[in-house]
Amino acid sequence: MCDVVLGSQWGDEGKGKLVDVLCDEVDVCARCQGGNNAGHTIVVGDTKYDFHMLPSGLVNPKCLNLVGSGVVIHVPSLFEELENLEKKGLHCRDRLFISSRAHLVFDFHQRTDKLKEAELSENKKSIGTTGKGIGPTYSTKASRSGIRVHHLVSEEPESWEEFKTRYHRLVDSRFKRYGNFEYDTEAELAKYEKYRELLKGHVVDSIDFMHSAIAQNKKILVEGANALMLDIDFGTYPYVTSSATGIGGVCTGLGIPPKAINKVYGVVKAYTTRVGEGPFPTEQLNEAGKTLQDIGAEFGVTTGRKRRCGWLDLVVLKYSTLINGYTSLNITKLDVLDTFKEIQIGVSYTYKGEKLNSFPEDLHKLAKVDVEYVTLPGWEEDITKIKNYNDLPENAKKYLKYIEDYLNVPIQWVGTGPSRDSMLVKDLN
């Protein structure tokens, strides 16, 4: 059976840390969607490991790791990430497997991404993408013109010629759309001819890989990227990513049925952050927001951009819970709230005087909602050295209880600092 870790807000919740903790006891860790457009840091002892595309389970020497079919892969970045891990003493190539059905991100996808974003910026409609080529790659995938891993590594005699034909066709369509954007196609093809050999040893039929593990009763952990509010269908469209970031993306990205899923863990930052453009009802453009940003060190791992900050939004989390069906929650970065005398939580939206029953899909409507807050007393003490959930300040426990009661989902873990040891486990019995 598979347990799943998913982001419940707009990303950057701290999913990697929970995955790292859980991976001590699993046999397989799998990424199901996304690309290197998101990132997180795992701290083991005194060493920090930055992950973008690779599964976090690589830090566990006994864990096999799969990059699934729903992931889009920029091969140079994949090997760069591997090399950076190796420089820090983490040698894990023999435990990394890549789906033959995953689509490839090329440099021209990244170039296209930036050109498209520049066009939107001129009309003040920028999405705020990372420029990693993720959207253009999913676009070519949806239009059935994309290039998959098996096209690159196939041993069939005509496969390399077919790869080059597909590649030139994609590049030519970009030239027609954007003109000559100073792109060296032959240099990139030469680069991929070398990557072809490097990649071959990692490529597997991911359907067989996953279902063999399930049949052998292996413990499997699925690591979702991004978060529900960035989902292509259920997020704040169009200010979203280009993949299915919720529970549905687990099945489609790995080729497993819903009945193979056991637990679904929702990761929730104790407040709310967002990178890039898009609606953010509980955003605090004031001293509270600045304090959250400073104490929380809210800067993106992938882009270095400042994250927008605000109070916890339970309307968002209720919506996220309905879609993903969390069996329990991991509240992260609770310690960031240590200095606040009072803490606010968004509990409902009203629009033109009427209370809304769900998170609105219309962004014009969303921009006009009034957020109703409840104010809870802060605990105003350092919780970073606490090792037992029961030793948390009473006001901290009341804050967590309010979240549990509102969502009707138990909290199983509470993060109180950046290291893997700064994770309190709550007894659910």
Curated annotation (Swiss-Prot):
One of its GO terms (cellular component) is cytoplasm. GO terms for biological process: 'de novo' AMP biosynthetic process; IMP metabolic process. GO terms for molecular function: adenylosuccinate synthase activity; GTP binding; magnesium ion binding. It comes from the Eukaryota. It catalyses: IMP + L-aspartate + GTP = N(6)-(1,2-dicarboxyethyl)-AMP + GDP + phosphate + 2 H(+). Substrate binds at V301, T302, T303, G304, R305, K306, R307. Its EC number is 6.3.4.4. Keywords: Cytoplasm, GTP-binding, Ligase, Magnesium, Metal-binding, Nucleotide-binding, Purine biosynthesis. Mg(2+) binds at D12, G39. It is found in: Cytoplasm. Its cofactor is Mg(2+). Binds 1 Mg(2+) ion per subunit. It holds the Pfam family Adenylsucc_synt. IMP binds at D12, E13, G14, K15, N37, A38, G39, H40, T130, R144, N226, T241, R305. Pathway: Purine metabolism; AMP biosynthesis via de novo pathway; AMP from IMP: step 1/2. GTP binds at residues 11-17, 39-41, 307, 333-335, 415-417. The active site is at D12 (proton acceptor), H40 (proton donor). It is an enzyme of class 6 (ligase). Homodimer. HAMAP family: Adenylosucc_synth (MF_00011). Belongs to the adenylosuccinate synthetase family. Plays an important role in the de novo pathway and in the salvage pathway of purine nucleotide biosynthesis. Catalyzes the first committed step in the biosynthesis of AMP from IMP. This is Adenylosuccinate synthetase.
